[in-house]
């Protein structure tokens, strides 16, 4: 590990935190019969509805194939509806999907916040958020190095 820069150590720590957080969230969300990915998809649909499958795929951390399978399952469970408007198929929440999200949302947000609230004060959280936003914006423009 001596050869690693602080940047690579931060990257590894973020990956480990993300994996641990996702595992714990998946376990936590079982009480609502949802996975972390499904929760994210329902939240994005509610926020931006109606939206297309491609628009949704850009907003979540699920592959295009994965999103298609997930939407089929969410539709079977009655959480979403897909409507064909001329050439465009849009996705919206049903009342049942809205109710499922409303049951899970406050508790999931509190659970996720606890990862930070338990160890960082408000000022530290603001600084971390600003730094992560800065890194995220840079990563969106980043290009792969030449071979």
Swiss-Prot record:
It comes from the Bacteria. Keywords: DNA-binding, Transcription, Transcription regulation. The keyword DNA-binding applies. SUPFAM superfamilies: Winged helix' DNA-binding domain. Pfam families: MarR. Residues 1-137 form the HTH marR-type domain. One of its GO terms (molecular function) is DNA-binding transcription factor activity. SMART domains: HTH_MARR. Residues 53-76 bind DNA. This is Uncharacterized HTH-type transcriptional regulator BALH_1720. The lineage of its organism: Bacteria, Bacillati, Bacillota, Bacilli, Bacillales.
